[in-house]
Each structure stands twice: as C-alpha cells, then as structure tokens.
Amino acid sequence: MKKIALSTLSLALLGAAGAAHAQSSVTLYGVIDTSLTYVHHTDGNKNLWALGNASGGDLSGTRWGLKGQEDLGGGLAAIFQLENGFDPSNGRLGQGNREFGRQAFVGLTSQTYGTLTLGRQYDPVVDLVQGITADNYFGSAFATPGDVDNYDNSSRTDNAIKYLSPTYAGFQFEAMYALGGVAGSTGSGQTWSLA
C-alpha cells in the first residue's frame, strides 16, 4: 500500500515538474540559403561554378539564432532573441562582422500590457508592414528608393527601446526610440519609428 502511494506521489510530482517546465522555452533556429551557380562563358571562354550567389541575390539571409521565453507569473514573461547572420560559402559573419548582428534583444511581454524590448532589433515598419510581401527581393516594388523607410528590411537599429501594444479591437501599434549612442550629444544619431 505504501509503495502504491509513494509511486502515485512520485508520478504527481513528476507531472507537476513537467507542467512548470513547459512554461519556459528556448528555441534554436536557422536558415541556410545558398545556391550553386554555373555561368557559361563568363569571361571569354571561361565557365564559372560558384557556391552562393556572387551578386548576393539569394532569397533570404542565412542565419541561426536562439530565442526564448521565461514565465515570470501573473501573465508576464521575460523574452530574448539572439540572431547571427553569416555567409554559408565561407563562414564569415555578416552585419558588420557582428556575432549577433541581425538581432540581439531582451524584453518583457504580457497579453494585457504588450511587449517592451531593448537592444538591436528591427523597426516597427519591418515588424508590422513589411510582412505583407514574401521577402525583400520580390517585395521591393513597394519600398522607397534607397530604402529610406526600411520597408525593404535592409537595416537594424542599435540601442532601441521598442513597445508593441496588445491588440485592441483588431488594432495594434508599435513604437520605437533608439538612443543615438554619441557621447555628449544626446540627440545625434537617434531614431524614432511608429507603425
């Protein structure tokens, strides 16, 4: 009888531990987008085989990353994302030779109050507007020349403080302010964005 009670208690505790563990997560993800290119008679009578697209025209940036969430209770969770971009043909880092040059942020999220993040991240135009096209190569017809609005998803913002509202009656907004990072000049290099 004691063995059955102890076994039942052990199973109940194991189940409770599994439920508590399920509330937190860390995900490893990635995309390798490369190509094998053959060009006939590139320079006189030479043929060219190359790994990767020499013009940089692969459809999606190669990347790997970690993202996670830790439940803090009361509907609040801590979140983070670290995303590395690299060239799959030679292993070189992208985004100015940064280890996590695509994204590197931490934050808090709540279904009631929204999400606040701090770090290197995309601006609100990329998060809420750019997604209506498949990618920046075919969707660039909607971007402004020179990508001054970052709709073409060509830049990330350092030192950014970003807030994403919860959805109210089908409406959601996102606002961002990025510190300039110029010592002695608080307004120099700052970024504002709203979508």
Where do the model's predicted regions map?
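Outer membrane beta-barrel
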Residues: 24-38, 49-180, 188
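Detector for outer-membrane/organellar transmembrane beta-barrel domains
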Residues: 189-195
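Gram-negative bacterial Sec-dependent N-terminal signal peptides
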Residues: 1-23
